[in-house]
Regions:
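Active-site neighborhood of phospho(di)ester-bond hydrolases with catalytic His/Asp-centered motifs
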Residues: 3-6, 23-31, 60, 177-182, ...
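Active-site-proximal loop/helix segment associated with metal-binding centers of metalloenzymes
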Residues: 96-178, 182-191, 197
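Conserved catalytic cores of phosphodiester-cleaving nucleases, focusing on short active-site segments
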Residues: 1-3, 103
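Active-site metal-binding motif and surrounding structural segment of the metallo-beta-lactamase
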Residues: 7-58, 86-88
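Metal-dependent catalytic neighborhoods of phosphoester/phosphodiester hydrolases
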Residues: 39-46, 70, 245-255
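Binuclear metal-ion centers of metallo-dependent hydrolases, dominated by the metallo-beta-lactamase
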Residues: 87, 91-92, 184-275
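A glycine-rich helix N-cap at a beta->alpha junction
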Residues: 74-88
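Short active-site oxyanion
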Residues: 1, 53-56, 174-176
Length: 275
């Protein structure tokens, strides 16, 4: 699942040694070039590599219309099916729903530009099997899967063994939210409440707070305020203005409010297992 697709997306995928065949869904937060213009090229490359199956593109209507026109010209006979899912700028959509993951949208505040964020919620996991107790109570193999989802076990003599005796609590489900371009907004805090990891843009530091407001962006301090208000586990800052030589002021501002803040770096991998 690829979230936003700037012109450097293919290069980043190659550096990370990600196979093109792994791209099944592309989520586009808004139609500014640094988030969208790499997508036509990526779709063409997928066809060139004869990737099969289906790629679902989740995008606003003008972007879908443009993609259809471009693909009709440069790659009209793709090796895979492209399924377009039109996004609602008001948010509130479920754009992906599998047995293990749900992806929903929420509205961002990026000036006059329609823009949404994405929230990824892992679905509740099954309970862990207590092998010693399962063997002790001689639970048949074909009954074990039902134990994972809360079923009790009834012995041949009618004795009921409670599920809690045979299982251990499940691993906590994880969640992640992505806020691409947005001004400070309490509604965003509501949308990302309780996630384990929040990516939030921090284009400016407080020295350019007025510019951030004018351009529909946030400062690092504002991003941390959103994260703290939402009770997130960790804040990941990105989308920094090129007017800064480094991100030291961003990190310092944010950590004054939320110490568990880190800076996004090219090629970074973050595990939620320890969150």
């Amino acid at each position: 699942m690829l979230v936003d697709c700037g012109e450097g997306a293919q290069l980043s995928m190659r550096r990370a040694r990600l196979k093109y065949s792994r791209v099944t869904d592309v989520l586009i937060s808004h139609l500014h070039g640094d988030h969208f213009l790499g997508l036509p090229g990526l779709l063409s490359t997928l066809s060139l590599h004869e990737v099969g199956g289906k790629v679902r593109v989740h995008c606003f209507r003008p972007g879908i219309e443009l993609l259809r026109h471009i693909m009709a010209v440069v790659a009209h006979d793709t090796s895979f099916e492209i399924e377009y899912n039109e996004l609602d700028p008001r948010g509130g959509q479920t754009v992906f729903d599998s047995k293990s993951l749900t992806v929903t949208t929420f509205r961002l505040s990026h000036g006059q530009t329609p823009c949404v964020g994405f929230r990824f919620d892992e679905k509740p996991k099954g309970r862990h099997i207590n092998g010693d107790m399962v063997r002790y109570h001689q639970v048949p193999v074909w009954k074990i899967e039902s134990l994972r989802w809360g079923a009790d076990f009834e012995k041949p003599d009618g004795t009921v063994i409670p599920n809690e005796t045979l299982t251990l609590p499940p691993s906590p489900s994880k969640s992640y939210a992505y806020c691409s371009d947005t001004a400070y907004s309490h509604k965003v805090a509501e949308a990302v409440r309780g996630v384990d990891l929040l990516y939030h843009e921090a284009t400016y530091c407080e020295d350019n707070g007025s510019k951030a407001a004018e351009r529909g962006h946030s400062t690092a301090r504002q991003a941390a305020m959103i994260a703290a208000e939402a009770g997130v586990g960790q804040l990941l800052l990105g989308h920094f203005s090129k007017s800064y030589v480094d991100e030291e002021c961003h990190l310092a501002e944010a950590r004054e409010i939320l110490p568990n803040t880190i800076i996004a770096k090219e090629g970074m991998k973050i595990s939620l297992l320890g969150q």
